[in-house]
Each structure stands twice: as C-alpha cells, then as structure tokens.
C-alpha cells in the first residue's frame, strides 16, 4: 500500500494538537501526492484500493488522490460516453417498454435541452421535475444539465402546501409532471395553489402565489395552460434551436449549480441542497470505480434501480454512474415494488441492485421469491439508513449479491463519502459503512469541544472535499451553520472510526440519548433488537424523565403473526447489553411517523411516545 508523506506530516501534527485539523485550510496538491522514496507508482486497477489509514491515533483520514477529478460538465460526459460506446444499451424503462442506446439517449437529450431553451428557459433558471421514476425524469435530468438549467428534484408525494414551499423556496420558472399517478393527481394539486394555470397561455403563466413560475409542461396529456413535453422535444430538433444550445454550452462551467435536492426535513422545513456538475460527476465516477463497473463487461454490469430518482441514490448512484461508466440502467417501476424489482432482475438479467434497507427487506420477503431467476446477480449498493447486520448477510446469501457494498453519505455530500470495497468481508460490510472515498477528508470530533476523537470513540462525523455542496439555496445562514470557514461539513451523524479506517454510524447527534450522564446511541440498540426472532423493525428514542434526564423507549413492530410482551423483551436484553441500555419503556407499534420521502421522524415519534406514556 502506498504511503503518503502528507499523511505522515498530518500524523505528527495531530500528535501535538488534536485541534489542528479543524483550522487547516487544505493540503496542497504537491503535498497530497508526494510518496515515500522507493514506493512504486500504482496501476489504474489498484488506485482505489490505496486507502490511507487514520493518522496519529485520531479519527481522521484522507482518501487517496490517485484518481484525477474531472472538470467535465454532465453534458460533456454524456457526449464522451455516447462517442465511446454508442451502441451500448443505456436505459431500459421496464414499465414503459422503452430502450435506448447511449447514442439514442444523447440525441433525445440534445433535442430536449434545445427545446427547453426554445421556450424561453435560460442558463441558471430552475426547472422542477415532479413525478415518479420514468423516462421523462431521466430525460429532464440530463437535458437540464446539457442546457445549464438547474433541475429541482420535487418529491412525487408532495401535496399542495409542500409543493408551494418547494417552488417558492428556489424560484422555479418551470414545472414538469405527468397528469397523475395512482391517486396523486398532479395537475389538480397544482391548481390548488395556482388556479391561474387553467386560463393561462402555455408558457406565459402569471401566478399570484408562485410569481416565478411561467411555464408548466405536461408529460403525457394536453392540459389547459400547459405545454406537452413531446412538443417541447420536437421543437428542439430545429436547427436554429440546436445552434442556440451549442452556443449556451460554450459558457457552462463544471462549477455551475446543476441540481437542487431537498433534504428530508426530519427536524424541520426542507432545505435546498445545491449541487454542481463537479460534485455529481466526480462522485458518480468514484462510486462506479469502487463497484469495479469499469472492469466489467456490459453483460456483467446491468444495474436495476428501484430507488427514486428524486433522491441522490437514484439520480447520482443510478443515472450518473450509468452515464459515467457506460453501463445499462434499468428502471423497474414508477415507485418501488418488491415484485416489480424481482421481475426486472429476472427478465432483464440484472446484475446490480441499489436500494434502501426497507426495499431489500421487501424484496427478500416476496412470497414467490424462489420463482424468479436471480442467477445473474452479482452485487449492489445498500444505503439511505442503517442496515442491521442480519439483513446484510441475508442479501449477500439469498440474493446472490457477493459484491454488495454498504454506502454512506448525505445529500449535501453529493452523496457518497464512505463505501465498502466489493471484496471486503461480510463482517466488514455488516459492521461498518466502509472506508472513505477518494479525494475526501473525514474527521470525527467531540460534539462539545470540537477536538478530534481518538479511534473507536464516538463523535460527530465531518466531511471536507470536492463533494461538499455549494450551499443551501437562498439560506446563507443555514449554509454557514453546516459548513464552517475551514470548509468542513458537519453531518450531524455520530460515528466511530477504527484502526483500518472503517467507519460505523451509531446515530444522529440529535437522537443521542443521555441517561443519567451515560451517552446511549439508538442505532446500537436497534441493531441489537433486530437479533430478536420476533422483531420486524424497531426505533429507539429518548423520552423525558425527571430523575435521569432521559429514559430509553423502544418502539417495536413485530413480525406478522408474532406476539410477545414488554417483560419478555427486557428479559431478552439481560446479560447481552449493559443494564443502563435496557429500555425502561417497551411500546409495540404498527407504524412510525414518516417524512414524505419515507424517512422516520424520530422527533415526532418521541413526542408520540411521551404523550402515550403520559410523561
């Protein structure tokens, strides 16, 4: 393994003062890339295996810099891939019966980008994409980037109030959506906050509540006051509009904003994390490198994506990784369905599967699971929330996903900052979120003093590097609260780092329970309770207590048909976890309060439990 001189110098600095990294402004490129005399250069195949170890006995690590960062825009990356593998299948939309090669995808994207410019949108304007996974979603994602327009990822479950907040927050000039999906009638929801659309001239909307919104585009139906997406794309094929597109592209920079993604709002109103071409292109490239997609044949690298495109795991881990590495992306359904996911794997010969722990649980629990052909499966990515070790082992063994990796990140970090290598052991995958990604610094600091923690000691995880967002759109104060002057982004996650650089997420800083002076991390207890044979899901929160400050409350959802008691659960804990970690309260529940994106809102769960327990 290569050893970096810069890392050795940092180790000596850390040994003298754990605070030095908090004020450091960054290593020079020469310092970063210097190697000890006599250490041979690395081949391209070895680069991502060169993971520097934590230094000085402290929880700090810097990813290697052997892989060069790209200055290309998303559009230039699509151009390059279409030129390199024009006939390679790029996109399969299983539920729409659509198949496109990279050459065909580029042609359609160019026309759509040209069409958006032809209707008056310009570089820097914001366009909201509001709807479930579809061909139109991918088309808008890439076309906006090609034209310098900023894509705003709007949750397809948003109702009128949430939609109004999002569109006003970032000043959306255009909005694209299907007429409806299941019970979600998008046009009717828009009319609740923008009744003027029914009588508006298409492309000339004037709305009292949404003053920035001028253009509404319907994906699949002629609706009053809207343009039809097919007509916009058709207009883009005209030569004068393509000329305008080529002119616009001359002024695009990799550091321009490309995407605004709203954080989940588990602790308040959603914030618009703003990402650049530079953020997304490089993160996608490094995800694919660590998955070894660049070393696989087209038949070995077909990616099935049930994750929503409005999340970073879908848009970056899915669309952008496919684009960067020339692999086939398969969208299996508009929204996640376990059965549809298995159908896509079987029919499309899927090799890699991306998803959250909940998605994988549903796939594994399909009653006809054994009837599907999963022989082509090789690996995938699990991310989005903590995954119990038992689930990791089940995915690897039952889904034939020996190359499964766990990924960790945040929307604000584009998103992935830690990830396993495919060849890590099952234990390393089950007990950690892997090791730091290239060109990324990570440190864990004491939440009270801000100093570096020693190895294997919990603290707040902070990230610095190319991946950190440009900021929260229109909220400089919140941006400054999240990203310090030293450019460290504070994740709010409590983590530990071991001697090999493996990182374990143990909870959110706001979720940490302090019981009689003892720090207790809910994720640790949740992992433990998942070993109980009757427990399907569990969430642990702290509830107020006059004597101890906080007490532990375990909110348990049992497997279907199972019954047990609080006393039996507590008996299960004895002798297996410390006595002060045994919950005082055990509450059996059937569901949890969720955000619209499906994340559990622990602050609401805490409120519900305190009310339920009359505290």
Curated annotation (Swiss-Prot):
Pfam families: AMP-binding (PF00501), AMP-binding_C (PF13193). ATP binds at residues 263-271, 493, 508, 599. Residues 1-42 form a transit peptide. Keywords: Acetylation, ATP-binding, Fatty acid metabolism, Ligase, Lipid metabolism, Mitochondrion, Nucleotide-binding, Transit peptide. It catalyses: a medium-chain fatty acid + ATP + CoA = a medium-chain fatty acyl-CoA + AMP + diphosphate; octanoate + ATP + CoA = octanoyl-CoA + AMP + diphosphate. The modification N6-acetyllysine is found at residues 179, 182, 199, 340, 398, 510, 544, 570. SUPFAM superfamilies: Acetyl-CoA synthetase-like. InterPro entries: AMP-bd_C, AMP-bd_C_sf, AMP-binding_CS, AMP-dep_synth/lig_dom, ANL_N_sf. GO terms for biological process: fatty acid metabolic process. Signal peptide: none annotated. Its EC number is 6.2.1.2. Its main location: mitochondrion. GO terms for cellular component: mitochondrion. One of its GO terms (molecular function) is medium-chain fatty acid-CoA ligase activity. It is found in: Mitochondrion. The modification N6-succinyllysine is found at residues 182, 478, 544, 570, 599. PROSITE patterns: AMP_BINDING (PS00455). Acyl-CoA synthases catalyze the initial reaction in fatty acid metabolism, by forming a thioester with CoA. Has some preference toward medium-chain substrates. Plays a role in adipocyte differentiation. Belongs to the ATP-dependent AMP-binding enzyme family. This is Medium-chain acyl-CoA ligase ACSF2, mitochondrial. The gene is ACSF2.
């Amino acid at each position: 393994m290569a050893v970096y001189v810069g890392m050795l110098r940092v180790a000596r600095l850390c040994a003298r003062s754990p605070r030095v990294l908090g004020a450091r402004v960054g290593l020079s490129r020469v310092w970063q890339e210097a190697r000890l005399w006599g250490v041979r250069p690395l081949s391209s195949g070895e680069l991502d295996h060169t993971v520097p170890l934590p230094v000085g006995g402290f929880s700090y690590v810097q990813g290697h810099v052997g892989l060069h960062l790209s200055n290309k825009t998303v559009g230039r990356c699509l151009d390059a891939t279409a030129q390199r593998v024009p006939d390679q299948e790029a996109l399969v939309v299983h539920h729409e019966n659509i198949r496109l090669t990279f050459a065909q995808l580029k042609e359609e994207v160019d026309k759509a980008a040209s069409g958006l410019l032809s209707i008056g949108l310009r570089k820097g304007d914001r366009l909201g994409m509001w709807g479930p996974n579809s061909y139109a979603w991918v088309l808008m994602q890439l076309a906006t980037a090609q034209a310098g327009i900023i894509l705003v990822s709007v949750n397809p479950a948003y109702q009128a109030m949430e939609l109004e907040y999002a569109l006003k927050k970032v000043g959306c000039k255009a909005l694209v959506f299907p007429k409806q999906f299941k019970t979600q009638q998008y046009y009717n929801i828009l009319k609740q906050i923008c009744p003027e659309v029914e009588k508006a001239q298409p492309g000339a909307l004037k709305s009292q509540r949404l003053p920035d919104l001028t253009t509404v585009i319907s994906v699949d139906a002629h609706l009053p006051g809207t343009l039809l997406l097919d007509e916009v794309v058709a207009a883009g094929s005209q030569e004068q509009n393509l000329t305008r597109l080529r002119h616009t592209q001359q002024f695009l920079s990799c550091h321009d904003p490309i995407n605004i993604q709203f954080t989940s709002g588990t602790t308040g109103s959603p914030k618009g994390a703003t990402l650049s071409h530079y953020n997304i292109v490089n993160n996608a490239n490094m995800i694919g490198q660590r998955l070894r997609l660049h070393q696989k044949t087209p038949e070995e690298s077909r990616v099935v994506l049930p994750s929503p495109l409005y999340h970073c795991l879908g848009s970056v881990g899915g669309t952008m990784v496919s684009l960067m590495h020339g692999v086939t992306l398969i969208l299996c359904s508009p929204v996640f369905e376990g059965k549809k996911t298995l159908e896509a794997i079987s029919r499309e010969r899927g090799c890699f599967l991306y998803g959250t722990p909940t998605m994988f649980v549903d796939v594994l629990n399909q009653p006809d699971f054994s009837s599907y052909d999963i022989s082509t499966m090789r690996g995938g990515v699990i991310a989005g929330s903590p995954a119990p070790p038992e689930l990791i082992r089940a995915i690897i063994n039952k889904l034939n996903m020996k190359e499964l990796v766990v990924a960790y990140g945040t929307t604000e970090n584009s998103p992935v900052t830690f990830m396993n290598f495919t060849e890590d052991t099952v234990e390393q995958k089950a007990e950690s979120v892997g090791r730091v990604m290239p060109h990324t610094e990570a440190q864990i600091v004491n939440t009270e003093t801000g100093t570096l923690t020693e190895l294997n000691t919990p603290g707040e995880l902070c990230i610095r590097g190319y991946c950190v967002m440009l900021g929260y759109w229109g909220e400089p104060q919140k941006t400054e609260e999240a990203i310090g002057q030293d450019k460290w982004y504070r994740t709010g996650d409590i983590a530990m780092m071991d001697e090999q650089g493996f990182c374990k997420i143990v909870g959110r800083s706001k979720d940490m329970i302090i019981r009689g002076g003892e720090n207790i991390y809910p994720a640790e207890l949740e992992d433990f309770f998942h070993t109980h044979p009757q427990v399907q899901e569990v969430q642990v929160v702290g509830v107020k207590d006059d004597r101890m400050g906080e007490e532990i409350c375990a909110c348990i959802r049992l497997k279907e048909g199972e019954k047990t008691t609080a006393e039996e659960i507590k008996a299960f804990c004895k002798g297996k976890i410390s006595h002060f970690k045994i919950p005082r309260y055990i509450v059996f529940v059937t569901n949890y309060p969720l955000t619209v994106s499906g994340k559990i809102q622990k602050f609401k769960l805490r409120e519900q439990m305190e009310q339920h327990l009359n505290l």
